[in-house]
């Protein structure tokens, strides 16, 4: 039975917050302030808080009191959901009070709140296309990212005309907590951050609004300082996996081409997810002089990964530091490895930490950001022939075996399927050669098979993308060159 939309929303706010029935008129006026009184008579059949919020926004747009741009609606939507979101002081007090007796419950409660108040965009994330496919490196995870709305041309124009502001300095700064937002900066009224101390400095723990995996978290430094891989990085990642049970923690590299999209603010990512790289076996065990207590090996993975395991955090940090320092200064002309040119460093590491079976684990992924005439985008970057699927930087998440592919592929891959079935003769020019190859390989393909064939091919191409990003190739020659670097580490003081 249809009920009044505003009244139903207010009822849900009261049920999901510390507001009381006596606050109903006050809350109703808060809603009218945000979406306009023109929605007063709109009815609804829904009782889900986020659905009700969306309906209020749609009603406001129809009434002319809410802007048509997604960014304008997000600003108002976040304010509506802020009504059920406790103050930062309350969020932090609740988290740490619960943490004393049950860390897992504290984390679970904060995650539940972040979903309930629509900070983690559960409905939007559900639109993503996601699947696993077997490759020679095990099952890889493929996602076509449809959760983030693409920029409307009107929004792009509005952003260009917006008054310039450097507050907050970036999207990771602590000052985003409760920030209203603007056309060119996301709405954060319902954003909350759990503070914690690391090395006697303030850090923040939050969830990613457009999560790429389960409980996708961000751990960021309280000050706006650039990312830097150092011995401190290894210690911090291990501290995080100790403090947040069941979570991994990793860092993007700190150099262009091989780094992530935000290099201006020190931060790490984590979450409760088992990535393909984690379950990849050891291709060859290695040993490091003076570290017989640390298990070490080269991982059977398309990228160049050393895995270290020990019960002793400090021993892992010491060895990882030695490997990092050696890699930063290591060159091997035959292997195409160059530490620096014209004073510009080329080498860094993408580190990932876990705690498993009572031991700490560090994966150190060797990165090299050289470019050349043949590979202007990066020698160890997706090469031209696979850029029709993935041309962006290979960051932390992809390194671990989860492809984040652009929204354009949803329709482009459907066109490729139709082309293979003979139901269309038009594919995007960048896919033409690939589509022709698939057609030649599958001349009698059926409608029941076509999606699986295309999806499998995308996964195989992603495996190639990771091979391109790998410094040492996965053949015997590459393994020998990798072991030569291990020998170099052992010869270092």
UniProtKB/Swiss-Prot annotation:
Pathway membership: Carbohydrate metabolism; galactose metabolism
Catalysed reaction, written as an equation: alpha-D-galactose 1-phosphate + UDP-alpha-D-glucose = alpha-D-glucose 1-phosphate + UDP-alpha-D-galactose
Pfam family for this entry, one: GalP_UDP_transf
EC top class, as a word: transferase
A biological-process GO annotation: galactose metabolic process
A single Gene Ontology CC term: cytoplasm
Gene Ontology molecular function terms on file: UDP-glucose:hexose-1-phosphate uridylyltransferase activity
Statement: the UniProt record of this protein carries the keyword Transferase: yes
Localization per record: Cytoplasm
Main subcellular location: cytoplasm
EC number: 2.7.7.12
InterPro entries named in the record: GalP_uridyl_Trfase_II, GalP_uridyl_Trfase_II_CS, GalP_Utransf_C, GalP_Utransf_N
Keyword terms of this UniProt record: Carbohydrate metabolism, Cytoplasm, Galactose metabolism, Nucleotidyltransferase, Transferase
Family of this protein: Belongs to the galactose-1-phosphate uridylyltransferase type 2 family.
HAMAP family from the UniProt entry: GalP_UDP_trans (MF_00571)
Record NCBIfam families: galT_2, PRK05270.1-2, PRK05270.1-5, PRK05270.2-2
Protein name: Galactose-1-phosphate uridylyltransferase
This protein's encoding gene: galT
């Amino acid at each position: 039975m249809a009920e009044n939309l505003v009244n139903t929303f207010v009822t849900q706010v009261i049920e999901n917050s510390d507001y009381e029935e006596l606050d109903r008129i006050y809350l109703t006026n808060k809603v009218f302030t945000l979406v306009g009184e023109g929605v007063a008579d709109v009815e609804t059949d829904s009782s889900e808080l986020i659905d009700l919020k969306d309906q209020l926004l749609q009603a406001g747009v129809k009434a002319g009191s809410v802007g048509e741009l997604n960014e304008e609606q997000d600003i108002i939507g976040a304010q509506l959901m802020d009504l059920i979101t406790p103050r930062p002081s309350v969020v932090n007090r609740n988290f740490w009070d619960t943490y004393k007796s049950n860390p897992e419950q504290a984390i679970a409660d904060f995650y539940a709140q972040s979903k309930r108040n629509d900070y983690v965009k559960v409905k939007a994330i559900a639109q993503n296309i996601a699947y696993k496919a077997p490759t020679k490196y095990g099952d890889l995870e493929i996602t076509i990212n449809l959760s983030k709305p693409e920029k409307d041309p009107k929004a792009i124009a509005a952003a260009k005309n917006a008054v310039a502001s450097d507050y907050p300095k970036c999207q990771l700064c602590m000052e985003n907590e409760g920030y209203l937002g603007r056309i060119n900066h996301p709405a954060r009224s319902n954003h909350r951050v759990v503070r914690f101390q690391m090395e006697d400095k303030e850090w923040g723990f939050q969830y990613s609004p457009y999560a790429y995996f389960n409980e996708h978290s961000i751990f960021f430094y309280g000050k706006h300082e650039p990312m830097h891989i150092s011995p401190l990085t290894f210690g911090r990642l291990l501290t995080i996996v100790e403090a947040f049970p069941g979570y991994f923690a990793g860092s993007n590299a700190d150099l262009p081409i091989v780094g992530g999209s935000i290099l201006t603010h020190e931060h790490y990512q984590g979450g409760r997810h088992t990535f393909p790289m984690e379950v990849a076996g050891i291709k060859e065990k290695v040993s490091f002089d003076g570290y017989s207590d640390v298990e070490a090996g080269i991982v059977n993975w398309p990228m160049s990964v050393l895995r270290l395991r020990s019960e002793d955090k400090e021993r892992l940090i010491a060895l990882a530091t030695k490997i990092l320092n050696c890699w930063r200064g290591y060159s091997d002309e035959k292997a195409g490895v160059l530490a620096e040119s014209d004073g510009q460093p080329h080498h860094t590491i993408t580190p990932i930490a876990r705690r498993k079976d009572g031991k700490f684990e560090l994966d150190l992924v060797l990165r090299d950001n050289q470019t050349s005439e043949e590979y202007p985008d990066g020698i160890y970057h997706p090469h031209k022939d696979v850029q029709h699927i993935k041309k962006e930087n290979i960051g932390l998440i992809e390194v671990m075996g989860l492809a984040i592919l652009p929204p354009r592929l949803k329709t482009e891959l459907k066109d490729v399927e139709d082309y293979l079935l003979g139901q269309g003769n038009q594919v995007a020019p960048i896919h033409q050669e690939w589509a022709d190859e698939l057609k030649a390989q599958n001349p009698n393909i059926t409608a029941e098979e076509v999606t699986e064939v295309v999806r499998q091919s995308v996964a195989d191409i992603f495996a190639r993308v990771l091979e391109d990003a790998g410094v040492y190739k996965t053949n015997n020659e590459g393994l020998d060159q990798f072991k030569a670097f291990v020998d170099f580490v052992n010869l270092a003081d």
